[in-house]
Curated annotation (Swiss-Prot):
Family, similarity comment: Belongs to the pantothenate synthetase family.
GO MF term (any one): pantoate-beta-alanine ligase activity
GO terms, biological process: pantothenate biosynthetic process
Binding site for (R)-pantoate: 65, 158
InterPro entries (alphabetical): Pantoate_ligase, Pantoate_ligase_C, Rossmann-like_a/b/a_fold
Gene (name only): panC
Residues given in the record as beta-alanine binding sites: 65
Annotated pathway: Cofactor biosynthesis; (R)-pantothenate biosynthesis; (R)-pantothenate from (R)-pantoate and beta-alanine: step 1/1
Other comments on record: The reaction proceeds by a bi uni uni bi ping pong mechanism.
Official protein name in the record: Pantothenate synthetase
Catalytic reactions of this protein: (R)-pantoate + beta-alanine + ATP = (R)-pantothenate + AMP + diphosphate + H(+)
Length: 283
């Protein structure tokens, strides 16, 4: 039987647990999550265990990154199952604050980041998202003071924004991106996949197939607009409403015009039924 991790729900409890860890000169890796854990999250945990002596997983459904019309109230919350999975992975500490702990009465601060990584992708469709993400991640870094922090590459724009923020603000954590975990048919693992109807679940892997096809055409020498146009046709033909399909510089996320502009990342967001999915691939 797996030993349950220590669970901290208040800042004093978190600090006591971390003081014990730090007294042993142990390195700490943080895996920030919103719960509803799946194999993609557990891959982050396993890599964290290889990088650091102790692993902290935060579980906090962050209201600040949801718009009023989004799924904050219905977002999957599976605490007992999450804790069992983390116990099986031998996680050391789970940080599970509530909203009043993270955003107490009178809270009025926000971390705002700028630069090309923030422009023209998710921000166009979820304008308050990154202000909520950077603020909560900044708070988590201040609370846990990790040596390493692990984020999945599925949320690639988020990964680049958080990496830049940690570097610019000297937050002390080395941000590590971890390749996207996928279902057997290629669909990127996501807590929101549970929203998909059987019909939409069958169509969902088209998103990844379209990215792979566009990347293949780019490597074969196709013009970027032609390759992306073909990918967009595949996506809409499968029943998706496309938000964006773009080629960006893989490090800065600046828009690019040709393969010569640097390493390329293709990023897509699209909606099928009521579910919005994102994905990305390297070229």
């Amino acid at each position: 039987m797996s030993r349950s991790p220590i669970v901290a729900r208040t800042l004093p409890a978190l600090r006591r647990a971390l003081d014990t860890i730090r007294a042993r000169k142990a390195s700490v890796a943080l895996v920030p999550t919103m719960g509803a854990l799946h194999e993609g999250h557990l891959a982050l945990v396993r890599l964290a265990k290889r990088r650091a002596s102790k692993v902290v997983v935060s579980i906090f459904v962050n209201p600040a990154q949801f718009a009023p019309n989004e799924d904050f109230a219905s977002y999957p919350r599976t605490w007992k199952a999450d804790l069992a999975k983390l116990a099986a992975e031998k996680v050391d500490l789970v940080w599970n604050p509530d909203a009043k702990t993270m955003y107490p009465a009178g809270f009025a601060s926000k971390i705002i980041t700028e630069g090309p990584a923030l422009v023209g992708l998710e921000d166009r469709f979820r304008p308050q998202f990154f202000g909520g993400v950077t603020t909560v991640v900044g708070k988590l870094f201040a609370q846990v003071r990790p040596d390493f922090a692990l984020f999945g590459e599925k949320d690639f724009q988020q990964l680049r924004v958080v990496t830049r923020m940690a570097r610019d603000l000297d937050l002390g954590a080395k941000v590590i991106g971890v390749p996207t975990m996928r279902e057997r048919d290629g669909l990127a693992m996501s807590s929101r996949n549970v929203y998909l109807s059987p019909e939409h679940r069958s169509a969902a892997p088209t998103l990844y197939r379209s990215l792979k096809e566009a990347a293949k055409r780019l490597r074969a020498g196709d013009d970027i607009d032609v390759a992306l146009g073909g990918g967009a046709e595949m996506i809409t033909a499968a029943g998706f409403k496309l938000d964006y399909l773009e080629a960006r510089h893989a490090e800065t996320l600046e828009p690019i015009a040709s393969l010569e502009d640097g390493p390329i990342r293709l990023l897509v967001a699209a909606r099928i039924g009521s579910t919005r999915l994102i994905d990305n691939v390297a070229v």
